A protein has these predicted regions:
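Conserved phosphate/anionic-ligand binding catalytic regions in large, soluble enzymes, centered on
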Residues: 1, 144-167
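Short, ordered loop/turn segments at secondary-structure junctions
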Residues: 28, 176, 246, 310-313
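Mobile "lid/hinge" segments at catalytic clefts and subdomain interfaces of large enzymes
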Residues: 168-270, 282
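Short glycine-/aliphatic-rich beta-strand segments at the starts of folded cytosolic domains
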Residues: 273-285
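Divalent metal-coordination and catalytic microenvironments
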Residues: 38, 151, 226, 298
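Glycine-rich nucleotide/cofactor/substrate-binding loop typically near the N-terminus or early
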Residues: 4-134, 194, 203-208, 213-214, ...
Length: 313
């Protein structure tokens, strides 16, 4: 929505060497605002509860996931598709989980640009390190369970491809705004922010803002993406907005889940600035000859100016 080339994104997603997923890109309404919705559609073997509000915040487990999204903007990738816009990626492997090495192999199997591939691996590395710290295991032993890994793989590869395609020099993230309370996940009910998010924002110095509403607004995947791309927290003093993107979240909170990205341009100042260090001291009982010699040495070694002022006490 901020200006990344959709054809580039779809070409990358078609090349992912994993089956069992599709995507749908559409416009949706959030708080009466039109936002871009990027939806990863998983087949029955990969469906998860990540967007099921009753499961996430209710007292009873829910298995309602809703139907698949079938529109003209929907593209299914993998052997389970029967549409003209489907792409097959080989057999469907029934792994219970994927390690970081296997995920790296999946990323290497795409036709992403090298710069985008490096970014995708960086995001997953940040995520794996945060999970490893949370569970007290080495990074090599962290496994992303398949019920949640496939959509994360697609999300992260898509994010890396889009950010790389935009060709931005800096990414400024003043803060991530987080909710409060608890959320249900695979390991039980956890406080918000969840441990993986906590570890990421601690490690990378990301500021969290308090929304004051219950719910998990910052997910581990989102925090990892932010940590990987953020270069600054401070907006430039003056800038020109040249692009604007609004992305829709999937969870249904009281406060609409929206992510805004602004493309900014800055101009070089018409003036030049420099910094000068001024040194001052009091000198007692020193001859004029010594002071004169000291002045010569200071000027020879780069001092802009040297002067003496007599002091009477």
């Amino acid at each position: 929505d901020a200006g990344a080339d959709r054809e580039v994104l779809e070409t990358v997603l078609r090349s992912i060497p994993v089956s069992g997923f599709g995507i749908a890109i559409s416009r949706v309404q959030k708080a009466a605002l039109s936002a871009c919705d990027f939806k990863v559609i998983l087949d029955a073997a990969h469906e998860n509860h990540d967007h099921d509000m009753k499961y996430l915040y209710g007292k009873e487990e829910s298995h309602a996931h809703g139907g698949h999204f079938h529109s003209e903007e929907s593209h299914t990738y993998g052997e389970h598709s029967h549409s003209e816009e489907s792409y097959t990626h080989g057999e469907h492997h029934h792994h219970e989980h994927r390690g970081l090495t296997e995920i790296y192999s999946i990323i290497d199997g795409t036709n992403m640009l090298d710069s985008a591939r490096i970014l995708a691996k960086k995001i997953f590395r940040i995520l794996a390190e945060a999970e490893a710290k949370a569970h007290g295991v080495p990074v090599e032993e962290v496994h992303f369970h398949e019920v949640g890994a496939l959509d994360s793989i697609v999300d992260i590869i898509a994010a890396a491809a889009c950010v790389d395609n935009l060709g931005v020099d800096e990414v400024i993230i003043p803060a991530l705004w987080e909710g409060e309370g608890t959320v249900r996940c695979q390991h039980g009910i956890l406080p918000v922010p969840v441990p993986a998010v906590t570890n990421i924002v601690m490690e990378y110095g990301i500021l969290l803002g308090k929304i004051g509403e219950p719910g998990e607004y910052v997910t581990p995947t989102g925090a990892a993406i932010a940590a990987a791309i953020c270069t600054s927290r401070e907006l430039p003093e003056c800038y020109r907005i040249v692009g604007n993107g609004l992305g829709a979240g999937k969870r249904d909170y009281k406060r609409p889940g929206l992510l805004r990205a602004l493309l900014l341009e800055t101009e070089e100042p018409v003036y030049e600035s420099d910094s000068i260090l001024k040194l001052e001291c009091n000198i007692d009982d020193c001859t004029g000859e010594a002071l004169g010699y000291a002045m010569e040495l200071l000027l020879e070694n780069g001092a802009r100016d040297v002067h003496y002022i007599p002091v009477y006490m």
